[in-house]
């Protein structure tokens, strides 16, 4: 007889992934609005069923917008509360697939990074990119140490080994702290063990990110810095300028292109500010590498 899997409640989920106390209290209060209204709670449960069936879809977007209106809370806050409620179900799915509770916690902790981003940038407890979490909840993206990974159809031939259309691993970099070289190496090794090699005895890794944009990286990353060492691990196969500088909020924690409003308190902020002030733009780099752990 299969052992019953105990599911956490929302407060336990938030505690496990280290939400700030203020955020815990906020989402407890928001969740209580659903508990007090039988129709609202019924809607929340049915939307969770829809989410795990179809994930991000027009129907879900429409139904969630009604919850924003009925509760009076900001959409980013309701979105996060919905994901926390859905995480209760996700914990059971992880357990059924044989993953440890610690592995579940490490993966779902991305919600903590996102709630802190939203608070720092917008002053709201919530999540700015609800759709992004689909990869977490459909178990296509996994956090392994410092980085996250999912399979991806490669766009370019690389190194006479990797071909366009091959399955490779896409690296994502959560805002969970510095990119220490030893943490990056440990994560690569974990990915190699978890997914297995993709090309011979090597694992093909790629990332398409603003952090790998050569004109910016080679000007503002000091030699020997964590960011520079991460950048130098990749061969850049393509780059594109982003005239909207859509990712600078990740450094300045403000969603504005008005340079006069950008803080220059950290070294990275100062260097990126000077880069932008000179009339240059950020962009995206498509980087690849082949990884095999050292014995």
Regions found by a protein language model. Give the residues of each.
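Non-catalytic substrate-recognition and accessory regions of acyl/acetyltransferase enzymes
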Residues: 2-179, 197-204, 215-295
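Conserved acetyl-CoA-binding loop-helix of GNAT-fold acetyltransferases
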Residues: 178-195, 205
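An acidic- and aromatic-residue-enriched active-site/binding cleft used to recognize and process polar
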Residues: 208-212
């Amino acid at each position: 007889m299969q052992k019953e899997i105990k599911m956490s409640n929302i407060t336990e989920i938030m505690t496990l992934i280290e939400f700030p106390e203020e955020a815990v209290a906020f989402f407890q209060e928001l969740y209580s609005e659903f508990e007090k209204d039988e129709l609202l709670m019924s809607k929340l449960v049915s939307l969770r069923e829809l989410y795990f069936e179809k994930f991000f879809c027009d129907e879900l977007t429409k139904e969630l917008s009604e919850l924003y209106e009925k509760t009076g809370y900001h959409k980013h806050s309701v979105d996060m509360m919905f994901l926390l409620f859905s995480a209760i179900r996700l914990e059971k799915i992880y357990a059924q697939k044989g993953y440890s509770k610690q592995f579940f916690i490490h993966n779902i902790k991305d919600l903590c990074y996102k709630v802190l981003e939203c608070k720092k940038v917008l002053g709201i407890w919530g999540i700015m990119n609800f759709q992004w979490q689909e990869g977490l909840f459909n178990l296509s993206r996994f956090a392994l140490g410092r980085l996250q990974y999912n399979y991806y159809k490669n766009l370019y031939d690389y190194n006479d080994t990797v071909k366009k259309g091959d399955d490779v691993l896409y690296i994502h970099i959560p805002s969970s702290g510095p990119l220490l070289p030893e943490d990056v190496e440990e994560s690569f090794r974990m990915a190699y063990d978890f997914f297995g090699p993709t090309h011979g005895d090597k694992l093909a890794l790629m990332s398409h990110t603003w952090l790998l944009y050569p004109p910016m990286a080679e000007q503002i990353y000091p030699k020997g810095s964590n960011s520079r060492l991460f950048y130098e691990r990749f061969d850049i196969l393509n780059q594109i300028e982003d005239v909207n500088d859509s990712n600078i909020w990740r450094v300045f924690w403000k969603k504005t292109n008005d340079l006069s409003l950008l803080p220059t308190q950290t070294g990275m902020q100062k260097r990126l500010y000077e880069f932008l002030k000179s009339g240059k733009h950020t962009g995206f780099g498509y980087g690849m590498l082949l990884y095999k752990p050292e014995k």
